[in-house]
Amino acid sequence: MHITIDRDAVCAADDMSHHREEFTVPDGITIASLFEFLEFKYIPVIARNNVVWALYHHEIKVGAYFTKIGSFVNGNIPLSSIISNSERDNEFYLRYYSSPDRYRKHFI
């Protein structure tokens, strides 16, 4: 399955490059497996590693990854079900939160 992912910049220097990339992933990949796949290929390393990456599919938050504790929101959901249920394309977006508290405040 081909997917396109874009992401937030994490610092001023990171703003200098484009973040939109295409990946080929297994058809049955879950949200947790996607984050594990992207962690070494795409997601930037952050000092102290206590950040949250939220995964969006066209403005709808479908999952999240808490990097310090290695925990996922909706980790077992396959990307293919998200795509087929939405009748939209294979584009996703990763939103960066500099701490779990900032992530929680955004949704409360």
PLM region spans:
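Short, conserved charged micro-motifs
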Residues: 30-33
